[in-house]
Amino acid sequence: MPIEDRDDAHVITHALAKHTLSELRSDETDQVAFRNGLVELGRLCGYEIIDGMMDTEYVSITTPLAETTGEVVKGLDDVVIVNVLRAATPFVEGLVEAFPHARQGVISAGRDEAAGMNEDGEFPITVDYVKLPDIDADDTVIVADPILATGSTMVAVLEEVLEQGTPERLVVLSAVSAPPGLARVNDSIPSADVLTVSVDERLDEDGYIVPGVGDAGDRAFGT
């Protein structure tokens, strides 16, 4: 699966990922189809991480007929997936299909919508709950949130993750990102690799991505 490298992100260009995201964007996509689409997109993104960001090695294999050499992915047992509640839940469901042996963590964090976005394009963030496994130096940690808008929530989440430990690789995974969010994450946590399916045009005055997909949590959960 191909990846396009930008200065601010790695962008997935695989045709099926783009197709699935296009279905998610449509306001005619109902709640069940939206949720299922996020699951599918999470699975595809997981394969992209394996293909583009993880190393392989050659091993000797004995088949029922002969000795041969196979190629395996290194580090599949050293993956931690962090679910940023709540919109990431179906996204992570698909991601776990690609990483069935991953350890998982959960962080509940969100904007203070009543306070609004300040002049720097940031929201106050409330972190309500953090439950993470141990993070080791040889781990790949994938922090999944389908929407990376202002980056305020993601930076708060990444700071919680790094308090738990410093992994070998820290990946921020989103479906749709906006330039201000990418800039904030890259400036605040330069060790993170951002992987996204689309970098959209801008944020509106309420901090939503345009054209985006709308409120991913509301659309996925029917609220």
Curated annotation (Swiss-Prot):
It is an enzyme of class 2 (transferase). Allosterically activated by GTP. Its EC number is 2.4.2.9. The keyword Iron does not apply. PANTHER family: ADENINE PHOSPHORIBOSYLTRANSFERASE, URACIL PHOSPHORIBOSYLTRANSFERASE, CHLOROPLASTIC. Belongs to the UPRTase family. This is Uracil phosphoribosyltransferase. It comes from Natronomonas pharaonis (strain ATCC 35678 / DSM 2160 / CIP 103997 / JCM 8858 / NBRC 14720 / NCIMB 2260 / Gabara) (Halobacterium pharaonis). The lineage of its organism: Archaea, Methanobacteriati, Methanobacteriota, Stenosarchaea group, Halobacteria. The gene is upp.
